């Protein structure tokens, strides 16, 4: 499934009935969110609003509104194929040399994919077809959405932020929301542990008082966008990973005003800087929790240049109580996480982040239990192995006879295999998403682990219950005579 840029991808979606063009004038203030939310909840297509009220630039929304479109963006036919992406990432995280000719032959596809990792640098690029700078910069010309009635201001939601630390060769790509506060100013809301914020902190330490260069790409190709939200190894750039997904090298171009490299095919690029002395209160905004978040101070991003393609498209989304687009992304990326975790913990059978748990706040893990205390080791591993699970508040561990994705199974295991005092692990004073207002202190809270596995000697002194199993001969006999019983006149089986 090949595409070169966002426009190629939209053509592919339209051919498959996965894109709907909206010609009726619709207001970016609240109305686009309402339409996109209804469409996403119905499993509908990506939406291209061609006539947003008050603007000449179209708005793309709900691009990754189904797991299928996330998989397509990663170059795969369906969600199940994302397990292979996870296996590739697990290999890149801890590459192993071939153990012999046969192993080398088996790993050739992985080595071949690695050839697409280096970026291709262009002298000129579509994203620089039109350039404005200085006083001509006006972010109000972009149809930035206001998503919820009590939001503080219009909000950029799909901005691919490009940064580089003072002592690093590779750039960092991250998705951080940005509040519009002036014709050339945005608030950069990045949490302190995220890559862009870490680059900024290192810059301030190395160059006190100096401006920190930042660029933001809007409407990059899907592989690059998804690369920025995928748990790539720290040694691998998001551009390199995008090349692996796409099957071709990622094309980049140097910015007009700084040395950062941005996706050459991006629809819009914002170039500028962060002044360490300029902060502003951000929010409140309706967030993925389904609540408005607290107001907090973050750095101000001053835009000095806007470059864009001819007839540029503005890519946007909204966040709210699941399901929303981030929740759908979480469902799809869940398949990527599983092989990465299994590489470190082979006993893990499945790993599931229920979307109704805000995509990351609760995890269900099933394991092949091998010893007493095994479930607790897995809990600690989930919390510590990947940064993505730093904010996971609840981890439920079950045996492999439980379907991690079936709440009927999980609740049955919790209520029959757990003693609340013995099998609950509480860890206090751990990092928590600052958006989690349920924690007693902003950014610091507790975690709970639930051991819903069968208990081994040493974990209990009682004889453990034996699960009921049907007699297979009786089952086979009843299967054979079921239709004759005619219990359900419509032929329904039981």
UniProtKB/Swiss-Prot annotation:
Keyword Transferase: no
Main location: membrane
Residue positions binding prenylated FMN: 175-177, 189-191, 194-195
Pathway involvement of the protein, from the record: Cofactor biosynthesis; ubiquinone biosynthesis
Catalytic reaction list: a 4-hydroxy-3-(all-trans-polyprenyl)benzoate + H(+) = a 2-(all-trans-polyprenyl)phenol + CO2
Free-text remark on how the cofactor is bound: Binds 1 prenylated FMN per subunit.
EC number from the UniProt entry: 4.1.1.98
Places the protein is found: Cell membrane
Matches recorded under SUPFAM superfamilies: FMN-binding split barrel (SSF50475), UbiD C-terminal domain-like (SSF143968)
Swiss-Prot/TrEMBL cofactor(s): prenylated FMN; Mn(2+)
Gene Ontology biological process terms in this record: ubiquinone biosynthetic process
GO molecular function: 3-octaprenyl-4-hydroxybenzoate carboxy-lyase activity; metal ion binding
Quaternary structure, from the entry: Homohexamer.
Entry's family note: Belongs to the UbiD family.
The name this protein goes by in its record: 3-octaprenyl-4-hydroxybenzoate carboxy-lyase
Gene that this polypeptide is encoded by: ubiD
């Amino acid at each position: 499934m090949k595409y070169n840029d966002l426009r190629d991808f939209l053509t592919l979606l339209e051919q498959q009935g996965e894109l709907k063009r909206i010609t009726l004038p619709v207001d970016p203030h609240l109305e686009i969110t309402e339409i996109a939310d209804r469409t996403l909840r119905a499993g509908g297509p990506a939406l291209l609003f061609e006539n947003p009220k008050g603007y000449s630039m179209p708005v793309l929304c709900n691009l990754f509104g189904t797991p299928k479109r996330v998989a397509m963006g990663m170059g795969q036919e369906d969600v199940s194929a994302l397990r292979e992406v996870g296996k590739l990432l697990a290999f890149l995280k801890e590459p192993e040399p071939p153990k012999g000719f046969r192993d080398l032959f088996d790993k050739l596809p992985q080595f071949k994919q690695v050839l697409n990792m280096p970026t291709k640098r262009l002298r000129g690029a579509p994203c620089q077809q039109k350039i404005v700078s200085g006083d001509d910069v006006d972010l109000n010309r972009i149809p930035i959405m206001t998503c919820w009635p009590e939001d503080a201001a219009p909000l950029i939601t799909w901005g691919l932020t490009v940064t580089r630390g003072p002592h690093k060769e590779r750039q960092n790509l991250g998705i951080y929301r940005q509040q519009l506060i002036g014709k050339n100013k945005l608030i950069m809301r990045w949490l302190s542990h995220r890559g862009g914020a870490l680059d900024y902190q290192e810059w301030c330490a190395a160059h006190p008082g100096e401006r920190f260069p930042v660029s933001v790409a809007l409407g990059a190709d899907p592989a690059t966008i998804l690369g920025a939200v995928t748990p790539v190894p720290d040694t691998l750039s998001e551009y390199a990973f995008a090349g692996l997904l796409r099957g071709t090298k990622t094309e980049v171009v140097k910015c007009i005003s700084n040395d950062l490299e941005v996706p050459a095919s991006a629809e819009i690029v914002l170039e500028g800087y962060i002044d360490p002395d300029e902060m502003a209160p951000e929010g409140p905004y309706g967030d993925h929790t389904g609540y408005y978040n607290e107001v907090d101070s973050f750095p101000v991003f001053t835009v000095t240049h806007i470059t864009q393609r001819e007839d540029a498209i503005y890519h946007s989304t909204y966040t709210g109580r699941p399901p929303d687009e981030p929740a759908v992304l979480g469902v799809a990326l869940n398949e990527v996480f599983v092989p990465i975790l299994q590489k470190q913990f082979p006993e893990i059978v499945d790993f599931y982040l229920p979307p109704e748990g805000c995509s990351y706040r609760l995890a269900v893990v099933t394991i092949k239990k091998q010893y007493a205390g095994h479930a607790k080791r897995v809990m600690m591993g989930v919390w510590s192995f990947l940064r993505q699970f730093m904010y996971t508040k609840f981890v439920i561990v079950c045996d492999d006879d439980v379907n991690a994705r079936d709440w009927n199974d999980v609740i049955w295991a919790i209520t029959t295999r757990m003693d609340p005092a013995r099998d609950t692990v509480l860890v206090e004073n751990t990092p928590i998403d600052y958006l989690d207002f349920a924690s007693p202190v902003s950014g610091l809270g507790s975690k709970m682990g639930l051991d819903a596995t069968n208990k081994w000697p040493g974990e209990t002194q009682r004889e453990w219950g034996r699960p009921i199993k049907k007699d297979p001969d009786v089952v086979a006999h009843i299967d054979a005579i079921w239709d004759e019983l005619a219990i359900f006149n419509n032929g329904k089986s039981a």
